[in-house]
């Protein structure tokens, strides 16, 4: 397997220096590229992320019901949230993919990016311990944990963007599918989202049109909050 370039730079972006860089390399390796891929690390990272976020919400909202806690956790650990984190880290620049995935734009696919985030969490746990993971994840999620509230319907990104623009009496966003790749059973959709307040369009890539629209809408919301 070829070495993945610029791992020290990625470590700085993540805020964690690996003692064993082979773990990070494995976390970035898709199953299409090598036998030693990231799926087991993803399994581990998914569980660690769930317990850390559950613990944070439990202590942050002592009066919240189990239902509210579950809904907030689902919002924070779902695929589109992980995809936004992956994009912030520019993980697509570091992924090791097989030729087929590379050709079909796998470095932009939301499921691959989200899985890579979970795999990196698993790799950090194996390289350190649960407490290190907890502190790092709370740093990654600081802004999202500060904004989330119980008792509030955890609306999807498209709904939130629409309501935000309507509140300002602005035109609604325009979504256009600009590319579809892959076989019928394994397609990748690229969707462009345009709004009047941004000079450039924002792109979302996912395994369905709806997911791609959600990803694009979430990125627009992030830009509008800056």
Curated annotation (Swiss-Prot):
InterPro entries in UniProt: dsRBD_dom (IPR014720), RNase_III (IPR011907), RNase_III_dom (IPR000999), RNase_III_sf (IPR036389)
Gene3D superfamilies in UniProt: 3.30.160.20, Ribonuclease III domain
Subcellular location: Cytoplasm
Any Pfam family: Ribonucleas_3_3
Keyword check for RNA-binding: yes
Entry keywords, A to Z: Cytoplasm, Endonuclease, Hydrolase, Magnesium, Metal-binding, mRNA processing, Nuclease, RNA-binding, rRNA processing, rRNA-binding, tRNA processing
Family: Belongs to the ribonuclease III family.
Subunit composition and interactions: Homodimer.
Name used for this protein in its record: Ribonuclease 3
Organism name: Shewanella sp. (strain MR-7)
Gene from which this protein is expressed: rnc
